[in-house]
């Protein structure tokens, strides 16, 4: 039983490491880049407010 748990844990670690591997390349010539974070501010704030509203609704139901 312990050996099986160890094998499963090792398998999970290997799969997680394989999914997390990436290559990063940095260059000083990128400047500001093509995508500015300011363009995505409104959808993110909308999602944040939506999640807050749903959390308030759910907390009201638990009473």
Swiss-Prot record:
This hormone, released from cells in the corpora cardiaca, causes release of diglycerides from the fat body and stimulation of muscles to use these diglycerides as an energy source during energy-demanding processes. Adipokinetic hormone precursor-related peptide (APRP) can form three type of disulfide-bond dimers: p1 (alpha-alpha), p2 (alpha-beta), and p3 (beta-beta). Belongs to the AKH/HRTH/RPCH family. The modification Threonine amide is found at residue 32. InterPro entries: Adipokinetic_hormone_CS, AKH/RPCH_hormone. Keywords: Amidation, Cleavage on pair of basic residues, Disulfide bond, Flight, Hormone, Neuropeptide, Pyrrolidone carboxylic acid, Secreted, Signal. One of its GO terms (cellular component) is extracellular region. Residues 1-22 form the signal peptide. It is found in: Secreted. It comes from the Eukaryota. The modification Pyrrolidone carboxylic acid is found at residue 23. GO terms for molecular function: hormone activity. This is Adipokinetic prohormone type 1. It comes from Schistocerca nitens (Vagrant locust).
């Amino acid at each position: 039983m312990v050996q099986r748990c160890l094998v499963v844990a090792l398998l999970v670690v290997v799969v997680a490491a394989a999914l997390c591997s990436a290559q990063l390349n940095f260059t000083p010539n990128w400047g500001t880049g093509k995508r500015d974070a300011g363009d995505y501010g409104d959808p993110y704030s909308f999602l944040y407010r939506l999640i807050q509203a749903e959390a308030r609704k759910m907390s009201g139901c638990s009473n």
